[in-house]
Swiss-Prot record:
It comes from Bos taurus. SMART domains: Carb_anhydrase. The lineage of its organism: Eukaryota, Metazoa, Chordata, Craniata, Vertebrata. It comes from the Eukaryota. Keywords: Disulfide bond, Glycoprotein, Lyase, Metal-binding, Secreted, Signal, Zinc. One of its GO terms (cellular component) is extracellular space. Its cofactor is Zn(2+). PANTHER family: CARBONIC ANHYDRASE (PTHR18952), CARBONIC ANHYDRASE 6 (PTHR18952:SF110). It catalyses: hydrogencarbonate + H(+) = CO2 + H2O. Glycans are attached at N62, N251. This is Carbonic anhydrase 6. The keyword 4Fe-4S does not apply. Residues 16-273 form the Alpha-carbonic anhydrase domain. It is found in: Secreted. Reversible hydration of carbon dioxide. Its role in saliva is unknown.
Amino acid sequence: MITLLFLLVVGAQAQHEWTYSEGVLDEKHWRLQYPDCGGTRQSPIDLKMKKVRYNPSLRALNLTGYGLRQGEFPMTNNGHTVQISLPSSMRMTTSDGSQYLAKQMHFHWGGDSSEISGSEHTVDGMRYIIEIHVVHYHSKYGSYEEAQNEPDGLAVLAALVEVKDYAENTYYSNFISHLEDIRYAGQSTVLRDLDIQDMLPGDLRYYYSYLGSLTTPSCTENVHWFVVADTVKLSKTQIEKLENSLLNHQNETIQNNYRSTQPLNHRVVEANFVSHPHQEYTLGSKLHFYLNNIDQNLEYLRRFIEQKITKRKKEKYWP
């Protein structure tokens, strides 16, 4: 009887699209349909500075073909995020000589009035505003489809995004301006003359490295992660545009599309630097981080209340 009920539940879930926090197949239940999501080598994780192991043999990543490129780059709203397809001529060579070919680039963000930060990886428990993933597959495999099921098949270059009072990041202008063209899930457009390297942090020399998984179903545990220590800087206007432009398959705004951090389970996180080269972890810096988040949360709460008041006024006069 129990087995029958389990099969009925799994069968019902198979008819649903996976989500992060709502519905039958939310994050807590991914593992029922995608067993790897319940594995012991899952991503993302919290990068705890005191537990990161310094490895002086880790050299800087070598990125080839990431600069300004002529041509067309398909960009799609897949119902979970915005995804940019990349040519395999973009390559990343790691410290051990492994070469990975680029497949796609996508983003994770917050946006909900009660939680604005949306990075997947956190640093000492602190969540950044956005996280960028450039997904690659090992060059020894003929395609991404072949590599995605191999134990050493994938690598992801991740970058965290900060927002304060920065001016507009012009390297993102082309990307941001085309979000309105893919508002609905399933819609696609084309970006032209894209420079991926300029969309990444200015200093790519320093990074954290560990073995993990894809952060969305099927959560396969075959990903070598490289999380860059430096950050991308975007303006508040650019952040808000990304957070509020796209709709999912239920025509709801795509927000908080990030997975919770997963247990490290005795894995080792390495870095090719002794101390964080771009941020001092002092009491003052942490206080500034939290005060900045409180300020932004209050602004989102104000806007949320204004929207509710406006909606109630409309319902009162136009029943």
